Amino acid sequence: MSNAKDNFNVADLTAALNAEDRDDLVNVLKNKLQGLTGKHSNVLENLSPNVRKRVEVLREIQTQHDELEAKFFEERAALEAKYQKQYQPLYAKRSEIVNGVVEVDGEATQTAAADEEEDKDSVEKGVPDFWVTAMKNNEVLAEEITERDEGALKFLKDIKWSRIENPKGFKLEFFFETNPYFTNTVLTKTYHMIDEDEPILEKAIGTEIEWHPGKCLTQKILKKKPKKGSKNSKPITKIEQCESFFNFFSPPQVPDDEEDIDEDAAEELQNLMEQDYDIGSTIRDKIIPHAVSWFTGEAAQDEDYIDLEDDEDEEDDEDEDEDEEDEEEEDEDEDDDDEDEHVTKTKKKSSAGRKRSGGAPAADGQPGERPPECKQQ
């Protein structure tokens, strides 16, 4: 997966977590939780009786909060489901216009430019390249879409999402016209969540794409000329996985044997799954509900504006820190100047004293004594 931060390739993703792997994961989590519980118990035991009582009351308050939060999540899900149904007629109308099924109402004012484009408009239906343009204008998705992908994504007619209940999660559906790349008319991506209210991914399942011969976008064929003098004169052909948006339909796979995966590989796998979920949630939460704004680029500008505000806030904080540092340095410089001035005055006084005394040592060794800096010379 082409992510600038992690530099992982989606081509390495192939399948979903199986039941055995999930059981192993649950056991590991249980062991960790037991260890954490022991640590928490030690914390409470180390508290004084009065403080421990207060903490116990705080825990009861937290339990009440968690119950309210659970109720909030439940009501929010019901509210989202209610409005999701009301969105559907709007999405259906959008799809009809985008795909040229219906024409918009009203007559446009005829101009000379419109006359020149009339023949072209009569052939051009709907809004060409609507979805691929919208997706490319999103920063997260733009990193996944290659030039080779664009040809296939031009046949994308619509994208829909829906909740699934058993197990909890959501499903994305990509509807395609008949195209020269693959035979599927619908590609799906399903996310199973451990907790619907929190983005904790259990597994993801994608459609197996049925590519036409020589049209697979997730692989590239490398041909290497045989070495001179080789008996085989035919070029050597090698197939390699390559970056492509369509790798999105091949989610990560955990090895059957957990011993085959080390800590670094496990961390990489986790990052891949997080990136995969990020792509899916971006399509669900941003592209589908605000598709025309992404098509025109307005949504991207809004995001850039928000990012710019955040950057300005960070710069302001940095400037304030720098100003404070400058003030501290100025104060230190002033202190140094005061010290230098004091030393100069001391030297002048000492010189005057030596002139008056003729430089002779005093009887007690103090009035005619040289200043400390002179002793060190």
From Swiss-Prot:
Compositional bias of type Acidic residues: which residue ranges?
A: 300-341
Q: At which positions is motif Nuclear localization signal? A: 223-228
Compositionally biased spans, kind Basic residues: 345-357
Subcellular localization(s) per the UniProt record: Nucleus; Cytoplasm
Tell me the residues on which Cysteine methyl ester occurs.
C374
Protein task: May modulate chromatin structure by regulation of nucleosome assembly/disassembly. Could function together with B-type cyclins in the regulation of microtubule dynamics.
Q: What name does this protein carry?
A: Nucleosome assembly protein 1;3
